[in-house]
From Swiss-Prot:
One of its GO terms (cellular component) is respiratory chain complex I. This is NADH-quinone oxidoreductase subunit B. Binds 1 [4Fe-4S] cluster. It comes from the Bacteria. One of its GO terms (molecular function) is 4 iron, 4 sulfur cluster binding. The gene is nuoB. It comes from Aeromonas salmonicida (strain A449). [4Fe-4S] cluster binds at residues 67-68, 133, 162. Its main location: membrane. PANTHER family: NADH DEHYDROGENASE, NADH DEHYDROGENASE [UBIQUINONE] IRON-SULFUR PROTEIN 7, MITOCHONDRIAL. Keywords: 4Fe-4S, Cell inner membrane, Cell membrane, Iron, Iron-sulfur, Membrane, Metal-binding, NAD, Quinone, Translocase, Transport, Ubiquinone. Residues 200-224 are annotated as: Disordered.
Length: 224
């Protein structure tokens, strides 16, 4: 599997955010295994254990911008039971949260606030873009709306829809868990320029393209 290595770029222009650079690399654990089977296997077990704890205890930041936030809140009700994924502990402060969901229309006036809240999240942190407005500006192709939060934030999972269903949020949460389970982060207590290795996950539209082509009878909304 290919990975994307992300490091801080001190030479990046001030206008660009975040200040980082990325490149495609191979699995770092596979490279370490060639140096020593014992240490390579031990590092793999440690990475899997840490990732297991992180992905099964994702605390979301209680933050919403527009109508998609209503659908996100619906996922926390008893019919959907988001507690199954360890994400029922909603935090009122970004310093206590693991990830934030941009649910709604990112206006230009709101962009600095969103960016500041993202910076207050402690590492490791992740971002889910929920809804057409957060993904690409939606139908608001106007001067006051940012055409996608990925213009100023690194996004891990995109949720399409206007607005998305609560089930779509749960699926995005599971996709984020799968991605976290394959991440390679430094385990040292020394902060340095080790970088973060994120797996290159395939897009769901590409993965399900063959299944959609085979469809001859459309399902009703109750069957989806």
């Amino acid at each position: 599997m290919k990975y994307t290595l992300t490091r801080i770029d001190p030479d990046a222009p001030v206008e660009r955010y975040p200040q980082e650079q990325s490149q495609t690399v191979d699995d770092p654990l596979a490279q370490d295994a060639t140096r020593g089977i014992m240490m390579g296997r031990l590092e793999e077990v440690l990475q899997d254990t840490v990732n297991w704890g992180r992905k099964n205890s994702l605390w979301p930041y209680n933050f919403g911008i527009s109508c998609c936030y209503v659908e996100m809140c619906t996922a926390f009700t008893s019919p959907h039971d988001v507690a199954r994924f360890g994400a029922e502990v909603i935090r009122a402060s970004p310093r206590q949260a693991d990830f934030m969901v941009i649910a709604g229309t990112p206006f230009i006036k709101m962009a600095p606030v969103i960016q500041r809240l993202y910076e207050q999240l402690l590492e490791p942190k992740w971002v889910i873009s929920m809804g057409a407005c957060a993904n690409s500006g939606g139908m608001y192709d106007i001067y006051s709306v940012v055409q996608g939060v990925d213009k100023f934030l690194p996004v891990d999972v995109y949720i399409p829809g206007c607005p998305p269903r609560p089930e779509a949020f749960l699926q995005a949460l599971m996709l984020l868990q799968d991605s976290i389970g394959k991440e390679r982060r430094p385990l040292s207590w020394v902060v340095g320029d080790q970088g973060i290795y994120r797996p290159d996950m395939p897009a769901e539209k590409d993965r399900k393209r063959g299944e959609r082509i085979k469809v001859t009878n459309l399902r009703t909304p109750d069957e989806i």
